[in-house]
Design a protein with these regions (language model features):
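Hydrophobic beta-strand anchors of alpha/beta hydrolase catalytic cores
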Residues: 82-83, 109, 156
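Thiol-/selenol-based redox modules, centered on thioredoxin-like
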Residues: 158-187
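Short active-site neighborhood of thiol/selenol oxidoreductases, capturing the structured segment around
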Residues: 70-94, 100
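Structural microenvironment flanking redox-active thiols in thiol-disulfide oxidoreductases
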Residues: 94-129, 140-146
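Short, internal strand/loop/helix patches
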Residues: 126-162
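Generic structural signal for well-ordered beta-strand positions
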Residues: 69-70, 166
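N-terminal targeting signals for export/organelle localization
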Residues: 1-62, 187
Length: 187
C-alpha cells in the first residue's frame, strides 16, 4: 500500500457527525419550556398558600375617598367581582395595575392596598400612578390579606354573582386572564 492509497480527510470533506438527540436545538428548547412549566406547577401551591375557598367573606369597606363598598350588594347585581390585593412596594403589583384599572371599567373591582401607606399617601400614590382612588381600600394592618388567606401579593379573587370564590390567582396574571376568569364565573 502506498502513501497515496490512504484516504485522508481534506478540508473539502463536509462530513458531519450527527448530533446526539439531546443536543438538538428543538429538543433543548422543548426541555427548557417543560422545565419552566414543571417549576411553575410545583411552586404554584406554595404561592397559593392557605387562600380561602368557597363563600367569600362579608365585606363592608370604605375606599380612601370615603366611598362605601359592600361585596354582597355588588354580588346581588348579577356580575362577578374582582378582589385585587396588592401593595405599593410590590414590583409585580406595579406591572399589573394598568390591567386592573382597565378591568374596572367593565367589572366591579375592590382594589385592596395592603401593608402600604396611610390614606393621604395612598391617595397621592393613586393620583401619581393614574389609578382610580374610588376603588382603593387601605388595608394598612393586613386584615383583608389575612382574611382571604393570601401569603403573597398580588392576589386576585374572582367572586361569582353567587358570592362563591371561583378563581384565585397569586402572582402576576394578565388582564386578559382575569377577564376570562370573570367572564367564565358568570356562566
Amino acid at each position: 500500500m502506498t502513501k497515496s492509497d490512504k484516504s485522508t480527510p481534506t478540508a473539502n470533506d463536509q462530513t458531519k457527525t450527527p448530533l446526539p438527540m439531546w443536543k438538538k436545538p428543538w429538543v433543548k428548547n422543548s426541555l427548557t419550556v417543560l422545565l419552566f412549566v414543571a417549576a411553575f406547577l410545583l411552586i404554584r401551591p406554595i404561592m397559593q398558600g392557605d387562600v380561602i375557598q368557597g363563600q367569600a367573606p362579608a365585606m363592608q369597606v370604605q375606599t380612601i375617598t370615603g366611598k362605601q363598598i359592600n361585596l354582597q350588594a355588588l354580588n346581588q347585581q348579577g356580575k362577578p367581582v374582582l378582589v385585587h390585593i396588592w401593595a405599593t412596594w410590590c414590583p409585580i403589583c406595579s406591572a399589573s395595575k394598568g390591567g386592573i384599572e382597565s378591568i374596572s371599567k367593565d367589572y366591579d373591582v375592590i382594589n385592596i392596598a395592603t401593608q402600604s401607606l396611610d390614606d393621604d399617601q395612598l391617595l397621592d400614590y393613586a393620583k401619581e400612578h393614574e389609578m382610580n382612588p374610588d376603588l382603593i381600600v387601605n388595608d394598612l394592618s393586613g386584615h383583608w390579606m389575612t382574611t382571604f388567606g393570601a401569603k403573597a401579593v398580588p392576589a386576585d379573587f374572582v367572586i361569582a354573582p353567587s358570592g362563591k370564590i371561583e378563581f384565585v390567582e397569586v402572582g402576576f396574571t394578565t388582564s386578559w386572564g382575569l377577564r376570562l376568569r370573570l367572564w367564565w364565573s358568570q356562566l
